[in-house]
A protein has these predicted regions:
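Glycine/acidic-rich beta-strand-loop module
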Residues: 28, 65-101
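Glycine-rich, phosphate-binding/catalytic loops in enzymes
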Residues: 47-50, 100-104
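Pseudouridine synthases involved in rRNA/tRNA modification
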Residues: 12-29, 35-40, 167-168, 189-264
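Short hydrophobic/aromatic beta-strand micro-patches
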Residues: 85-87, 111-113, 177
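Intrinsic disorder/low-complexity segments
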Residues: 1-15
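Short beta-strand segments enriched for Tyr within beta-sheet-rich domains
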Residues: 95, 182-190
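Residue-level signal for inorganic ion chemistry
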Residues: 33-34, 84, 110, 155, ...
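Glycine- and acidic-residue-rich catalytic/RNA-contacting loop of pseudouridine synthases
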Residues: 39-57, 92, 112-172, 223-225
Length: 264
């Protein structure tokens, strides 16, 4: 706790634009709560802020003494929530092995369209990049395909609610537990069972909305169709099997969306 407080004081004076919250820190790792829209790694040679860059600034002393910044569980730019970061080579190797052995447990919260007919469901469906098998206007878009990598996700309904919007009125808060770690896994699996994530520009109501967003940015039309400017997915829990875990609540934007007109 003292180390976290010291970090906060240093960043208040040195880096006032710190864009994440420190949840826990030891000599081996730091756990942070990433806000939506913050990139994990640089994707272009620009000055856009990234979690990796800010962590390197935060851990400059450790890096100068032989440490490193190794992000263990990567999140998409729009996904918020917990990220585990190794500060040493030994810790990075250890966490990598835990990931391979599926001993690093991850749980997400997602807001989806509609009320599922089930309370708990396991989706076991292999995923592959769509462009390998058919035309795809979006290079990174994934699809369910038997030739792809195995992927399994467990879903549980946490809350059903009604909210009057321009695009629908029934929504659910879902807990998603991925048993594998494929690209866009939770989003594709939810879309495949007819309940895409609210705000999802690629797997939501129409993939052309993503292309429109790339061309024009956020518009009134996109807001009316998607309701949220980012997909409603949050990394809510991380746990090392048999050791310890971390939790973080829904961020303000998703918590406010879950304030229903009526809850079932």
């Amino acid at each position: 706790m003292a180390l976290i407080l010291l970090r906060s004081l240093l960043h208040y004076s040195i880096t006032p634009l710190l864009q994440f919250k420190i949840i826990d820190e030891t000599d081996d790792y730091v756990v942070v709560d990433k806000p939506p829209f913050l990139l994990i790694h640089p994707t272009k040679p620009t000055c856009a802020p990234t979690l990796w860059k800010q962590l390197r600034e935060l851990l400059a002393f450790e890096i100068a003494s032989g440490g490193q910044v190794s992000i263990v569980n990567r999140l998409d730019r729009e996904t918020s929530g917990l990220v585990l970061v190794a500060k040493t080579a030994d810790a990075a190797r250890r966490f990598g092995l835990l990931m391979q052995r599926q001993q690093l447990r991850k749980e997400y919260l997602a807001i989806i369209w509609g009320w599922p007919e089930w309370e708990t469901k396991i989706v076991d469906a292999a995923l592959d990049r769509q462009g390998k098998h058919q035309h795809s206007a979006i290079w990174l878009k994934q699809m369910i395909h038997p030739a792809g990598a195995s992927a399994q996700t467990k879903f549980h309904v946490e809350q059903r609610f009604v909210k009057s919007t321009t695009a629908g009125d029934k929504f659910s808060l879902i807990r998603a537990i991925p048993h594998t770690g494929r690209t866009h896994q939770i989003r594709v699996h939810l879309s495949s069972v007819g309940h895409p994530v609210v705000g999802d520009k690629i797997y939501g109501p129409d993939e052309r909305l993503y292309l429109r967003f790339i061309e024009t940015g956020w518009t009134v039309e996109l807001e009316q169709r998607l309701l949220l400017p980012r997909h409603a997915l949050h990394s809510a829990k991380l746990a090392i099997e048999g050791e310890r875990g971390w939790n973080t609540p829904l961020p303000v934007d998703l918590a406010e969306f879950c304030s229903p007109d009526w809850s079932g």
